[in-house]
């Protein structure tokens, strides 16, 4: 009798080990798994074990497998390294040792190493898989390629797979990608475009391993299974705040080359914690088992995230980090790093469910404990007449009410879902979650474990085992689609850019950090609770803190100049606008304010929305200085920015809001629709003498202001109050207040921020009134006041 070869063992393995021949199922097809980077750290620590678990779970259900470990290493050395990695495979605790040994042996026989370095290597792999399937008479179900390699290698590998290793008709291809997925929005978009030229979206599975952690994976099922109890609670009326936390005790030693490029925000907040945030904040689809519906609702949550500003975050760095960087990367002494190893970020979700609820994201290295959790803290709206000693955990409404998805480690030491007993008794499926016995003396978030209904997994599984199973079964909701990835980078990139030169707060690390990293929030602004102690100075760099300076008053182009650090400047401008509003309302009963768009005023809008409760919004009319010729709902629309960052947060009567009519008769800025004339007529009818109480302008790097551009005479003189103009950048068509109308204002404030404005600031300071070259130079109110508001970077460089 001829003995079967290695690949001929496939059917024998399934028959003997899993099913017994009399009960053997018909094969559902053969699956080839190719692990690229098979000898790397991630593969050794998690991926081979995850693939072994996949083999245990699925081979007995009718599938046959082959496992190809691949790397750049030469065959002999690679085989030795892979064999060493496979030595640590383990079976479930409830499996008999003899059975475990048998299964391990079968898995090893089905696993082989091969070098994948050249196009010819990939061609040979494709031929070998096809030959194996044909030789054994198997039906091919699909091929899984796991990229456990650096992203810079993705393109070449993808090209080779696409050209040489695609399966035939009827079989699937699944390509698994590991982070990082870019460094910012642009790089992520470039990588996504490159991969998209080789693979279809449904073929790609971007891994965020936190989505495989059992407590995180339970968030949506928990919300679904407890809909009745949560429907009335999971909203801004009842939730005080949400905390999404990942703390580590280890530092970045040995990984500083990676950390210098990415830092803590890119490493954990942009991906892991943001993915968790969307699971908490998203609207529940009718069917949480439908991947498409889940992903669609998650994307809606991404799009509802309020834009982050510099004041949305605090950053820190453990004290020995810069020295580690110098040592590992061989940098010269006196070259401190500005890379944050700690970050706290305040996020708001701008929709009806979550308006005003703070989501706190925090992660860091060299902290006092290793722990991860999601904590939903509910408002305490009860008053208890009896003293605290009479409060019963299951009955008293005065005790804290919270739901915690405990990711792991910490005092508890394992994944768990905890619900305060005074909230409701939760349902979790008994086959996968069991109630935790009380552990006297254990305190979680200041309360004994007995205060909670606490559940832990019946069987703990590592994240990669869960995710590999989801890949095998094409459960896309556990992965990051391209559209979600880019939405996340759109959200995080502006903050990362604003922090690029920020000096992080130094902290000793561990328990010695004390209260140094405690932070607090007010409105949309986050700040450390304590000042930086002198003994931790000098830090990395010597940039002074904003609090070291007062607001500076001076002259610019013969008009008053106010200069300060950005936070102080915005605060001063907001206060001045409020003072002007109060004065106008007291004098004539209304305040007419014309606002510019762009990125600079966003911080001002947020400041006005969150910190000026005495502002007479009910008597304020809001106008636009200029508008892009796009629908008002378009992200490029100035009105959309005003709506997102100001209007939805304050009580301005809707009839006092005056967007520019750029979209009439289903057309954008058509001359024959006379939108500019209509806006001018509205101004004439409502604004006395067409004189706004205050006009807020900006200044472009080319000297343009409003949508009045250099080398274009449109809107610089004449009788027209509102004009259509052409911008050199897209979208080209604009509507704008004219320069004569702007100069009728009682007060004009020009806000100029950022180092990129330094050159034009210097140039405009030296020229006369030449609006055709530099439209901003034509701003000079006829009988009103002009005030310049510049941050130090724009003014001093």
Swiss-Prot record:
Keywords tagged on the record: Carbohydrate metabolism, Endoplasmic reticulum, Glucose metabolism, Glycoprotein, Hydrolase, Multifunctional enzyme, NAD, NADP, Oxidoreductase, Pyrrolidone carboxylic acid, Signal
Report which reactions are catalysed by this protein.
D-glucose 6-phosphate + NAD(+) = 6-phospho-D-glucono-1,5-lactone + NADH + H(+); D-glucose 6-phosphate + NADP(+) = 6-phospho-D-glucono-1,5-lactone + NADPH + H(+); 6-phospho-D-glucono-1,5-lactone + H2O = 6-phospho-D-gluconate + H(+); 2-deoxy-D-glucose 6-phosphate + NAD(+) = 2-deoxy-6-phospho-D-glucono-1,5-lactone + NADH + H(+)
Gene that encodes it: H6PD
Specify the taxonomic lineage.
Eukaryota, Metazoa, Chordata, Craniata, Vertebrata
Annotated residues that bind D-glucose 6-phosphate are located at 179, 209-213, 248, 267, 365, 370
Which EC number applies?
1.1.1.47, 1.1.1.363, 3.1.1.31
Specify which residues bind NADP(+) 2 according to the UniProt entry for this protein.
375, 623
Spell out the PROSITE patterns in the cross-references.
Answer: G6P_DEHYDROGENASE
Pfam families, per the entry:
G6PD_C, G6PD_N, Glucosamine_iso
Q: Describe its function.
A: Bifunctional enzyme localized in the lumen of the endoplasmic reticulum that catalyzes the first two steps of the oxidative branch of the pentose phosphate pathway/shunt, an alternative to glycolysis and a major source of reducing power and metabolic intermediates for biosynthetic processes. Has a hexose-6-phosphate dehydrogenase activity, with broad substrate specificity compared to glucose-6-phosphate 1-dehydrogenase/G6PD, and catalyzes the first step of the pentose phosphate pathway.
The listed locations are: Endoplasmic reticulum lumen
Source superkingdom? Eukaryota
Q: Which residues lie within the region annotated 6-phosphogluconolactonase? A: 546-797
Report the GO terms under cellular component.
endoplasmic reticulum lumen
PANTHER family, alphabetized? GDH_6PGL ENDOPLASMIC BIFUNCTIONAL PROTEIN, GLUCOSE-6-PHOSPHATE 1-DEHYDROGENASE G6PD
Positions of region (Hexose-6-phosphate dehydrogenase): 25-531
Q: Which residues carry this modification: N6-succinyllysine?
A: 213
Q: Where is this region: Linker?
A: 532-545
Signal sequence annotation: 1-24
Subunit structure, briefly? Answer: Homodimer.
GO MF, one term, reads:
6-phosphogluconolactonase activity
Q: Which residues are glycosylated?
A: 162, 287, 689
Tell me the residue numbers annotated for binding NADP(+) 1. Answer: 37-44, 154, 179
Q: Family per UniProt?
A: In the N-terminal section; belongs to the glucose-6-phosphate dehydrogenase family. In the C-terminal section; belongs to the glucosamine/galactosamine-6-phosphate isomerase family. 6-phosphogluconolactonase subfamily.
| Residues recorded with modification Pyrrolidone carboxylic acid | 25
Biological pathway: Carbohydrate degradation; pentose phosphate pathway; D-ribulose 5-phosphate from D-glucose 6-phosphate (oxidative stage); Carbohydrate degradation; pentose phosphate pathway; D-ribulose 5-phosphate from D-glucose 6-phosphate (oxidative stage): step 2/3
Q: Return the protein name.
A: GDH/6PGL endoplasmic bifunctional protein
């Amino acid at each position: 009798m001829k003995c079967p070869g290695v690949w001929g063992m496939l059917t024998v393995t399934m028959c003997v080990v899993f099913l017994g021949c009399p009960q053997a199922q018909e094969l559902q097809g053969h699956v080839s798994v190719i692990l690229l980077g098979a000898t790397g750290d991630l593969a050794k620590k998690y991926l081979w074990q995850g693939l072994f678990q996949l083999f245990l779970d699925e081979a007995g259900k009718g599938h046959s497998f082959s496992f190809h470990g691949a790397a750049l290493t030469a065959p002999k050395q690679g085989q030795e390294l892979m064999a060493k990695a496979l030595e640590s495979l383990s079976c479930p605790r409830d499996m008999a040792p003899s059975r475990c040994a048998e299964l391990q042996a079968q898995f090893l026989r089905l696993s082989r190493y091969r070098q994948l370095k050249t196009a010819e290597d990939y061609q040979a792999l494709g031929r070998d898989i096809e030959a194996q399937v044909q030789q054994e008479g198997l039906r091919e179900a699909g091929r899984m390629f796991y990229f456990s390699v650096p992203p810079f290698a993705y393109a070449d590998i993808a090209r080779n797979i696409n050209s040489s290793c695609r399966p035939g008709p009827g079989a699937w291809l699944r390509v698994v990608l590991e982070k990082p997925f870019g460094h910012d929005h642009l790089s992520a978009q470039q990588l996504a475009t490159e991969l998209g030229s080789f693979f279809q979206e449904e073929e790609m599975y971007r891994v965020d391993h936190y989505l495989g952690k059992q407590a995180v994976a339970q968030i949506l099922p928990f919300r679904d299974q407890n809909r009745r109890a949560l429907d009335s609670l999971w909203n801004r009326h009842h939730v005080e705040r949400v905390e999404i936390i990942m703390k580590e005790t280890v530092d970045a030693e040995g990984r500083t080359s990676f950390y210098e490029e990415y830092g803590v925000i890119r490493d954990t907040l942009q991906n892991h914690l943001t993915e968790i945030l969307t699971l908490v904040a998203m609207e529940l689809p009718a069917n949480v088992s439908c991947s498409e519906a889940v992903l669609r609702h998650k994307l809606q949550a991404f799009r509802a995230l309020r834009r982050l500003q510099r004041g949305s975050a605090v950053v820190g760095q453990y004290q020995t980090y810069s020295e580690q960087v110098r040592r590992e990367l061989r940098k010269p002494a006196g070259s401190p790093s500005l890379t944050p190893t700690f970050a706290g970020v305040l996020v708001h979700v701008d929709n009806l469910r979550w308006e005003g609820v703070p989501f706190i994201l925090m992660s860091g290295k060299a902290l006092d404990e290793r722990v991860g959790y999601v904590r939903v803290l509910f408002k305490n709206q009860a008053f208890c007449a009896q003293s605290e000693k009479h409060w019963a955990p299951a009955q008293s409404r005065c005790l804290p009410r919270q739901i915690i998805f405990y990711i792991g480690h910490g005092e508890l030491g394992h994944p768990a879902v905890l619900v305060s007993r005074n909230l409701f008794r939760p349902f979790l499926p008994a086959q996968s979650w069991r109630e935790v016995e009380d552990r006297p003396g254990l305190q979680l978030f200041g309360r004994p474990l007995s205060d909670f209904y606490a559940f832990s997994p019946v069987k703990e599984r590592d994240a990669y085992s869960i995710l590999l199973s989801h890949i095998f079964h094409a459960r896309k909701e556990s992965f990051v689609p391209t559209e979600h990835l880019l939405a996340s980078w759109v959200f995080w990139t502006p903050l990362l850019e604003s922090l690029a030169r920020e000096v992080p707060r130094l902290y000793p690390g561990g328990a010695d950090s004390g209260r140094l990293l405690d932070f607090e929030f007010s409105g949309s602004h986050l700040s450390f609770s304590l000042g930086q102690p002198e003994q931790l100075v000098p830090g990395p760099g010597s940039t002074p803190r904003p609090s070291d300076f007062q607001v500076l008053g001076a002259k610019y182009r013969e008009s008053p100049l106010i200069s300060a650090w950005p936070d102080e400047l915005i605060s001063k401008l907001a206060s001045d606008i409020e003072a002007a509003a109060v004065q106008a309302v007291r004098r004539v009963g209304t305040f007419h304010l014309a606002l510019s768009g762009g990125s600079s005023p966003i911080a001002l809008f947020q400041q006005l929305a969150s910190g000026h409760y005495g502002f007479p919004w009910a008597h304020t009319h809001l106008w636009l200085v200029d508008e892009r010729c796009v629908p008002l709902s378009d992200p490029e629309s100035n009105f959309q920015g005003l709506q997102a960052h100001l209007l939805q947060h304050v009580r301005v009567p809707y009839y006092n809001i005056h967007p520019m009519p750029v979209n009439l008769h289903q057309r954008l800025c058509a001359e024959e629709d006379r939108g500019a004339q209509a806006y001018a007529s509205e101004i004439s009818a409502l604004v006395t003498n067409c004189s706004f109480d205050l006009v807020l302008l900006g200044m472009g790097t080319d000297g343009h202001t409003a949508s009045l551009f250099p080398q274009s005479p449109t809107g610089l003189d004449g009788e027209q109050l509102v004009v259509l103009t052409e911008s050199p950048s897209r979208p080209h068509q604009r509507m704008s207040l004219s320069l004569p109308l702007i100069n009728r204002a009682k007060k004009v404030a020009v806000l100029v921020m950022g180092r990129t404005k330094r050159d034009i600031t210097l140039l405009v300071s030296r020229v006369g009134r030449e609006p055709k070259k530099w439209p901003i130079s034509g701003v000079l109110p006829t009988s009103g006041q002009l005030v310049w508001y510049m941050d130090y970077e724009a003014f001093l460089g």
